[in-house]
Amino acid sequence: MVKKMKLKFLFLILSLLIFTNKSYAGDLTVNDIKSRQIVVCGTSSDYRSLAYKKNDRLEGFDADICRAFATAIFGNSENFKLVYIKRKNIGKALNSGKIDIMLGHTSLSSNEEVSQNVLPVDTLYYDKQVFVSRIQTKATSMNEFAKNKVCVLKNSNAAIFAKEYNNKHALGFNIIEFPDLAALKEAFYTNRCELASDSEIFINDFVRNIKTDNPTQILPETITYIPIKAYTAGNSTQLNTAFRWIINALKLAYSNGITAQTIETFTSSRSTSIQNLLGINQKSWMSMGLLPEWVKDYINTSGNYMQVMDRNIGKSSKLEIDNPQNELIENGGLLVVQPFI
């Protein structure tokens, strides 16, 4: 009898543990993050411009976006950490609760979203796939590179698009795939291929950071545009909603010209969207479990969407990338902003 009771008790404890783990990992909420007292963002080790340390402080686009989440949840922009996650492990990291949101220059295919059980949050920015050449050239057409060897990342979207581009334009490329981006870079700089193809941000990053006597040139041809998105676990719908509106808030501030210098002039705005955005009407942010005036705090320290983009990836960054797709749709770009109502 005692033995049976012990077994039943043990079974009950195990059941509760399993249920708790599934509840936490499968349906993460803002309150779960609050109880942990830190927000955890996934990033990629392949893109230095997204996450790096400078004077013991995390810098880069992903660091600044994660600061927005920390400011909105805790009122402290430094209550966050970044974790390097490989592409194949994104779903596992999200659904196990290892990270709350995946940033890290991620653009998953439909098959990857389904198989990894992840949910897109919002488009963070647009990148584009380009070619880089080992030699300086005055070529005016990609036909002049016909039959060249092209380095790409194995089983990547870049490999798929490079092959489709090659077939479409009948260039006869010999496309060589490498298991990771480090191997791709090494192959390119040891003359195993004349061209390499990947995202403009990655290509700019490694061309500028690897010391070599070999001249290189990023070619003007665009293979495709790449929407870079944030992702949450597939069942974390409440958290997904909160993160989506946080990202939208930075874009909305930019679309209205809200900066640290102008923000006080907007506190008397009669726009419902602006009143909700700045926490004058507190209900909208509080309904998501977020601090109502976090946008004002973040804008004053880090700026709006375009200021974050520009200093980390855009024209004012070391990459000096001028990508018009990262403008608002009304300015000829692809970014769409929702009113906060």
Question: Where is each model-derived feature located?
Answer:
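Sec/Tat signal peptide C-region and signal peptidase I cleavage site
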Residues: 21-25
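Bacterial N-terminal signal peptides
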Residues: 11-18
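Extended ligand-binding regions for polar small-molecule ligands
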Residues: 67, 71, 135-139, 143-144, ...
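Solvent-exposed, polar/charged alpha-helical surfaces in well-ordered, non-transmembrane soluble domains
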Residues: 31, 63-71, 88, 92, ...
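Acidic, polar ligand-binding/catalytic clefts
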Residues: 67, 71, 75, 79-144, ...
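C-terminal functional modules
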Residues: 280-341
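Bilobed "Venus flytrap"/periplasmic-binding protein-like clamshell domains
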Residues: 40-49, 58-73, 107, 127-179, ...
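Extracytoplasmic small-molecule ligand-binding "clamshell" domains
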Residues: 27-103, 290, 294, 298-302, ...
